[in-house]
Curated annotation (Swiss-Prot):
Keywords: ATP-binding, DNA replication, Nucleotide-binding. This is Replication factor C large subunit. ATP binds at G46, P47, P48, G49, S50, G51, K52, T53. Residues 420-482 are annotated as: Disordered. One of its GO terms (molecular function) is ATP binding. The gene is rfcL. CDD domains: AAA, HLD_clamp_RFC. Residues 442-476 have a biased composition (Basic and acidic residues). It comes from Methanococcus maripaludis (strain C7 / ATCC BAA-1331).
């Protein structure tokens, strides 16, 4: 059975439900392209089922463009994008029509199968002569950071709940079955702004043979792909406990990540110092509970951390703040991406120290702190440390600076014996030969001793021994034993 989503996909922008501003922007963009004005590619960003791909196909149909699409089910690595997209971006189709290139779900590019895909897309976009439309569910993924600078971003919001029932009625009429108005409204409310999900639910009920209100109420809520930006808006704007705690329930992010988002955007929303202080106070208490979860491995504390960071932050303000606030991803994520190389170099240094000291890299960091002090104060000792831990000049420059690294390695170079190159011996001239006169060995003079006293002492001892032999009755003295 054909899916109704494809069967009743709008063929024209006029048939697309809602998105009036987005449609106007797309019309202006495509007409400028047709008139010869160079335009940046369009990136349509929005939740699943909001109609991003439908908008791309509808505008292609309205302006008679052929479509070449690569979606998440296709392999989209560097070679595929270069061959398929790269060729299509600079040529016409076989029918002579202009070509619209659609790259669907570019935020899904990941893993070995899509290696190098984003970089190749950016390269293709710079030379593209045909219009390109990209779609993404989460445009703020780190992998798309460089891509965002090469496109015009258009946010496509969820389809309004009131725009879904007319579409469902139209499909039911064409399929030839009657449906109660309450059933239509129930399906629409469960869809959570996802028109595609609403159509699939309608088809599911119709093929099941029962289209009653009770059956519609048993449908699962489809708001499972709620954006982190929606969660931020709810938490920052509401003053109700239940609404705040449910804001992150369907967001597929860890609590630690949500905490970073709230911490980043609190100062953007809370303009009163008291509100801001109260908000960070609740957030700090949430962080304490998160720490206890990991330290004790008791995950029952999750709910306390979640309530403190959502409801606690929401109720920290005295009243709602009106007006639009532009929320942003945590700056720490961007910083971590930028400092990835530096952190890897530090890991390599710590591994060398840990290997020599037979400790962990965590303990090696304490050793490194003292080593840096030595590097900056004592070049001789530093040279020995560098040789022992087998550190490179680049690593010392990373820890200190180029001057200190140069001085330390100069000391190391001075300790090594110089290997002189052998030069061919020249024949010496007669006048260059210097006669070598061997030095006479020094004759050491005997120590001056009182010779007379030595002789007299020897004679006296001899006479004494002879006398003792002649008189055996007399007891010998102890001197005879020596």
């Amino acid at each position: 059975m054909e899916e109704w989503v494809e069967k009743y996909r709008p063929k024209s922008l006029n048939d697309v439900a809602g998105h009036n501003k987005t449609k106007e922007s797309l019309i202006e963009w495509i007409e400028s392209f047709i008139n010869g004005q160079k335009q940046k590619p369009i990136l349509l960003a929005g939740p699943p089922g909001s109609g991003k791909t439908t908008l791309a196909y509808a505008i292609a149909k309205d302006y008679a463009f052929d479509v070449i699409e690569l979606n998440a089910s296709d392999k989209r690595n560097k070679d595929v994008i270069s061959q398929v997209v790269g060729t299509a971006a600079t040529s016409k189709s076989l029918t002579g029509k202009r070509t619209l290139i659609v790259l669907d779900e570019v935020d899904g590019l990941s893993g070995n199968d899509d290696r190098g895909g984003v970089a190749e897309i950016i390269k293709v976009l710079k030379t593209a002569e045909n219009p390109v439309i990209l779609t993404a569910n989460d445009v703020y993924k780190p992998a798309l950071m460089t891509l965002r600078n090469s496109v015009n971003l258009i946010n496509v919001g969820s389809v309004h709940t009131n725009s879904i029932p007319p579409v469902l009625r139209k499909i039911a009429l064409k399929e030839g079955f009657e449906i109660d108005e309450k059933v239509i409204k129930t399906i629409a409310s469960h869809a959570g702004g996802d028109l595609r999900a609403a159509i699939n639910d309608l088809q599911s009920l119709a093929t099941g043979g029962s289209i009653e209100v009770e059956d519609a109420k048993e449908l699962p809520d489809r708001d499972s792909e709620k954006s982190i930006f929606d969660a931020m808006r709810i938490i920052m704007k509401t003053t109700h406990y239940d609404i705040a705690t449910s804001a992150t329930r369907d967001v597929k992010e860890e609590l630690g990540t949500i905490e970073e988002w709230i911490s980043e955007n609190l100062p953007k929303e809370y303009l009163k110092y008291k509100d801001l202080a109260n908000g960070y106070d609740y957030l700090s208490k949430s962080d304490v509970f998160l720490g206890r979860v990991f330290r004790r491995q008791y995950f029952g504390l999750w709910r306390y951390a979640s309530a403190l960071m959502t409801a606690g932050t929401a109720l920290a303000k005295e009243e709602k703040y009106r007006g639009f606030t532009r929320y942003a991803p945590p700056a720490i994520f961007t910083k971590l991406s930028r400092t990835k190389g530096s952190r890897q170099r530090m890991k390599d240094i710590l591994k060398k120290i840990a290997l020599k000291t037979h400790t962990s890299t965590k303990r090696a960091r304490n050793t490194l702190d003292y080593m840096v002090v030595v590097f900056e104060s004592n070049e001789a000792v530093s040279a020995e440390l560098v040789e022992y831990y087998e550190l490179t000049k680049e690593e010392i420059e990373f820890l200190t600076n180029k001057t200190i690294a140069k001085n330390i390695f100069s000391v190391i170079a001075g300790k090594k014996p110089k290997v002189e190159k052998e030069t061919p011996k020249k024949k010496k001239k007669a006048e260059d030969v210097v006669p070598i006169i061997p030095k006479r060995p020094k004759i050491s003079e005997p120590p001056k001793e009182p010779l007379k006293e030595v002789i007299e002492e020897t004679v006296e001892k001899t006479d004494k021994k002879e006398k003792e032999k002649k008189d055996p009755k007399k007891q010998a003295t102890l001197d005879s034993f020596f």
